[in-house]
Amino acid sequence: MSDSQDPTTSPVVTTQVELGGCSRQGGGNGFLRFRQHQEVQAFLSLLEDSFVQEFLSKDPCFQISDKYLLAMVLVYFQRAHLKLSEYTHSSLFLALYLANDMEEDLEGPKCEIFPWALGKDWCLRVGKFLHQRDKLWARMGFRAVVSRQCCEEVMAKEPFHWAWTRDRRPHHGGVQRVCPQVPVRLPRGPGLSPPHCSPCGLPQHCSSHLLKPVSSKCPSLTSECHRPPSQNYLSRVKNAWGGDFLIVLPPQMQLEPGTYSLRIFPKPPARPGH
């Protein structure tokens, strides 16, 4: 600045830096902070929508909508510079699907988004949905990577909101080889209960209470949340991937990762008269 320039008429220089994948504004612009506050509140209000609430309740294991994936949705909204009027069901499902694309290895669970986003004839509209996802991605400048630090900065703006209590359990994280005894038909869509999850101890009729933990009415220790006694046994099923067979353990038997020896005893001969 020259000595003759009046500092009161000089333009305010605003700097923008990337910290942990999140934009941070400098220069003391209060409007930007107010705008960010509006965006957070609009997003949290969208999560309170009854249709979104129902969708989230069908994901009791938080496989496609845990707290980090939800935080990524808000980051995507901000990177795409969505208007507040664009904070809609459609935008949420597009951004959530893109977040799953970026972070999740399994393809099956995220397909549950299709019937919620597209309705009854969703299978005829998947192509258009994926095109809209790509348009959102382009609108974001193809910046879909979000760091954990960035997600936690988003959560810190409203640290006590129930959405940030959606912690995924360890057995649903990491790389896993999935060998289901009975294939689960996905997606299920609105009006149907989510698949039963033995490790989480969440039967279908209990999952609807687990959206907001403070209102949970189905503790895991009650008899209603246990599997039927008839299923508490070792069972042998055909291995679709080759080999002899798979052993399916009852939910009460929790084994640490390692190598185990399996001893199979011959079936005792039938007694006479039986």
From Swiss-Prot:
Region (Speedy/Ringo box), start-end ranges: 37-169
InterPro entries: Speedy, Speedy-Ringo_regulator
Keywords, in A-Z order: Cell cycle, Cytoplasm
Pfam families: Spy1
Highest rank taxon of the organism: Eukaryota
Location in the cell: Cytoplasm
Domain notes: The C-terminus is required for CDK2-activation, but not CDK2-binding.
Similarity section: Belongs to the Speedy/Ringo family.
PANTHER family (alphabetical): SEEDY PROTEIN A/C FAMILY MEMBER (PTHR31545), SPEEDY PROTEIN C (PTHR31545:SF2)
Role played: Promotes progression through the cell cycle via binding and activation of CDK1 and CDK2. Involved in the spindle-assembly checkpoint. Required for recruitment of MAD2L1, BUBR1 and BUB1 to kinetochores. Required for the correct localization of the active form of Aurora B in prometaphase.
Protein name: Speedy protein C
Source organism (scientific name): Homo sapiens
The encoding gene: SPDYC
